[in-house]
Amino acid sequence: MASAISHAQLNAQLSQGTVAPLYAVVGEEDLLRDMALGALKTALLGEGQSDFNCDLFYGDDASGTEIVTCASEVAVFSARRVVVVRAADKLPARECEALLPYLKEPNDTTAMIFAAPKLDGRLKFTQALTRTAVMVDCSPLREAQWLPWLRQDAER
């Protein structure tokens, strides 16, 4: 199982130009999830092109085949394309099955990002995702973590 990185570690990796084809942004803290998604989109696509090569799906309304098809497309006027699946925890099991082959061999020019408050570790999809994706931990911060986090955020 891949170890999870913090929001700060994600920002450090992105500032060094280190990107992965698969990310799982997981945790109950909505603000941290949204900030991680924003940082990923900006780092992967740049400031002005975030909508042109970015596709957004919602787990409760998405087809696994459609997500894979979209992720397999070539980026236009950019080095990368980004596919975001919000509420990935709500993807039906049959749609998750369609994603398994892609998780084994992701497209190098696409970053697929799954975001959810929590994922069910019993599912094959979640097990495959935790083995192959960069896991970004967006759990609520403990009291001692708030002040350093606020300082770092204010510096940006």
Predicted feature residues:
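Conserved beta/loop motifs at nucleotide-recognition and modification sites
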Residues: M1-R156
